[in-house]
């Protein structure tokens, strides 16, 4: 069974810890990998928007020394690909105003990804307000989805599904002051069959729980774990929120 199939068949919302290679050295990567493993995380995402391709292979190998959790690439560009990962979110930034982020980067990366034998998970990537002020939003030249217009997110999600994509990543941006609204998650869940990944601005167990209850298949936490005083405790509290 593929990793994607296991993700879709999971009976509960999965917790993914995001590691940004641009912000970590080997020891930092190992520390967060231990926290993810001991805290009960289900997945580790590796990637970022600026400079994340630098030493990505070394970071992933460091993570693998501390954890058996599946590693999924969350690429910010064509340099965010590694043969040492278990899968890659093969993403199209649908609400970018720059065609490079919609299809050109994907075309450049597709053949190397296939040659590496990486499992590709076709994913629509949508950046929601206030994500335009995040690194991903700035680099990706986005026209952000308004927070109070969940029907716009649904329109993109429906188009993604009709194009054959199987997942959608609703992103508010790393460290966002406000996460993706639960109502937006709920509407996409009710009106499509896409797997839903939600990330950005999820700083508390309550925010995580609300998005899980709205229908998210995967919750992604990164900045809260990286910048917190106790990474293990942070992972555990997020995991407990998904159990309740």
Swiss-Prot record:
The keyword Nucleotide-binding does not apply. Sn-glycerol 1-phosphate binds at residues 169-175, 200-201, 222-223. Mg(2+) binds at residues 20, 49. Its cofactor is Mg(2+). It is found in: Cytoplasm. Its EC number is 2.5.1.41. GO terms for cellular component: cytoplasm. GO terms for biological process: glycerophospholipid biosynthetic process. It comes from the Archaea. GO terms for molecular function: imidazoleglycerol-phosphate synthase activity; magnesium ion binding; phosphoglycerol geranylgeranyltransferase activity. It is an enzyme of class 2 (transferase). Pathway: Membrane lipid metabolism; glycerophospholipid metabolism. It catalyses: sn-glycerol 1-phosphate + (2E,6E,10E)-geranylgeranyl diphosphate = sn-3-O-(geranylgeranyl)glycerol 1-phosphate + diphosphate. Keywords: Cytoplasm, Lipid biosynthesis, Lipid metabolism, Magnesium, Metal-binding, Phospholipid biosynthesis, Phospholipid metabolism, Transferase. Prenyltransferase that catalyzes the transfer of the geranylgeranyl moiety of geranylgeranyl diphosphate (GGPP) to the C3 hydroxyl of sn-glycerol-1-phosphate (G1P). This reaction is the first ether-bond-formation step in the biosynthesis of archaeal membrane lipids. Belongs to the GGGP/HepGP synthase family. Group II subfamily. This is Geranylgeranylglyceryl phosphate synthase. It comes from Korarchaeum cryptofilum (strain OPF8).
């Amino acid at each position: 069974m593929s990793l994607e199939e296991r993700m879709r068949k999971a009976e509960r919302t999965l917790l993914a810890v995001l590691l940004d290679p641009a912000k970590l050295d080997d020891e930092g990567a190992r520390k967060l990998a231990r926290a993810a493993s001991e805290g009960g995380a289900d997945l580790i995402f590796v990637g970022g928007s600026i400079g994340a391709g630098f030493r990505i292979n070394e970071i992933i190998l460091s993570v693998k020394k501390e954890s058996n959790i599946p590693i999924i690439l969350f690429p910010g560009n064509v340099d965010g690909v590694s043969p040492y990962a278990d899968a890659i979110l093969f993403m199209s930034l649908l609400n970018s105003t720059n065609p490079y982020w919609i299809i050109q980067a994907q075309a450049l990366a597709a053949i190397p990804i296939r040659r590496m034998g990486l499992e590709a998970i076709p994913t629509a990537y949508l950046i929601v307000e206030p994500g335009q002020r995040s690194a991903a939003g700035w680099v990706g030249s986005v026209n952000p989805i308004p927070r109070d217009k969940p029907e716009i997110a649904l329109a993109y999600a429906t188009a993604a599904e009709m194009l054959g994509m199987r997942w959608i990543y609703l992103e508010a941006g790393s460290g966002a002051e406000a996460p993706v609204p639960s109502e937006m998650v709920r509407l996409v869940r009710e009106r499509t069959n896409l797997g839903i990944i939600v990330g950005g601005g999820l700083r508390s167990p309550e925010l995580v729980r609300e998005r899980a209850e709205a229908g998210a298949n995967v919750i992604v936490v990164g900045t809260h774990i990286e910048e917190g005083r106790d990474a293990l405790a942070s992972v555990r509290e997020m995991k407990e929120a998904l159990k309740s």
